C-alpha cells in the first residue's frame, strides 16, 4: 500500500526580498512569500477576475543560499517542495501555519529576467540580456548528481551523421491566442 505523495509545484513571483538566516550548525534557511495568480472571466458580468494566493516558502541548505543571493522582490521562480503544517502555542492559543518546504529533495529554478530597478552587476547571472543564466533557466537541486556505473565498451561507436542546421521558426507576430499569461 502506498504511503502517499506530498509534492507541491509553484510558479510565482516573490512578494518581498527573501529573508536569509543561519542555523547554529551553519546551514542556511531562507523564507520568502511567493504569489501565484489565476484569472478567469465571470460568467454573469463578463468581467475578468483575478485571484492572487500567497504562499510561505522555506528553503534549506545550498538552495537557500542561492535563493537569498539571487531572488529579489518581483523575481519569478519555480518551486518544487512538500507541504508542511507547523503548530505552536502563543498566549495560550494554538496557532498553525502551512508552508512549502524546499529541502534536499526539492528544487528551485530562477525564471525570467531581473526585476525592474535591480542593479546590473558583474555576477555570472548577468549575461544574455539580463536573464538569469544567459537566457536559460538555472535549476538548483539539493540532491547530488547520480553516478552511473561504467559499462565496458563492446565496439567502437561510429560518429553520428551531421544534421542540417535548424532553421529559424516561422514569424509568430500575427499569432493571437487567448492564453491568460
UniProtKB/Swiss-Prot annotation:
Question: What's a Gene Ontology MF term here?
Answer: single-stranded DNA binding
| Low complexity bias (residue ranges) | 112-126, 137-157
Region described as Disordered: spans on this chain: 111-181
A Gene Ontology BP annotation from the UniProt entry:
DNA replication
Q: Which Pfam families match?
A: SSB
**Its biological function?**
Plays an important role in DNA replication, recombination and repair. Binds to ssDNA and to an array of partner proteins to recruit them to their sites of action during DNA metabolism.
UniProt name for this protein: Single-stranded DNA-binding protein
Q: Which organism is this entry from?
A: Pseudomonas putida (strain ATCC 47054 / DSM 6125 / CFBP 8728 / NCIMB 11950 / KT2440)
Amino acid at each position: 500500500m502506498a504511503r502517499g505523495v506530498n509534492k507541491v509545484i509553484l510558479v510565482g513571483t516573490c512578494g518581498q526580498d527573501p529573508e536569509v538566516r543561519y542555523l547554529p550548525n551553519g546551514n542556511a534557511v531562507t523564507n520568502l512569500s511567493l504569489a501565484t495568480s489565476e484569472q478567469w472571466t465571470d460568467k454573469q458580468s463578463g468581467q475578468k477576475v483575478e485571484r492572487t494566493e500567497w504562499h510561505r516558502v522555506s528553503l534549506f541548505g545550498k538552495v537557500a543560499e542561492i535563493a537569498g543571493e539571487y531572488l529579489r522582490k518581483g523575481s519569478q521562480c519555480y518551486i518544487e517542495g512538500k507541504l508542511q503544517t507547523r503548530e505552536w502555542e502563543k498566549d495560550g492559543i494554538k496557532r498553525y501555519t502551512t508552508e512549502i518546504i524546499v529541502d534536499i529533495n526539492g528544487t528551485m529554478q530562477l525564471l525570467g529576467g531581473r526585476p525592474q530597478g535591480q542593479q546590473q552587476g558583474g555576477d555570472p547571472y548577468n549575461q544574455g540580456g539580463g536573464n538569469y543564466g544567459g537566457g536559460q533557466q538555472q535549476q538548483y537541486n539539493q540532491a547530488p548528481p547520480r553516478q552511473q556505473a561504467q559499462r565496458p565498451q563492446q565496439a567502437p561507436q561510429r560518429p553520428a551523421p551531421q544534421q542540417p542546421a535548424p532553421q529559424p521558426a516561422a514569424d509568430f507576430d500575427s499569432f493571437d491566442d487567448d492564453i491568460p499569461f
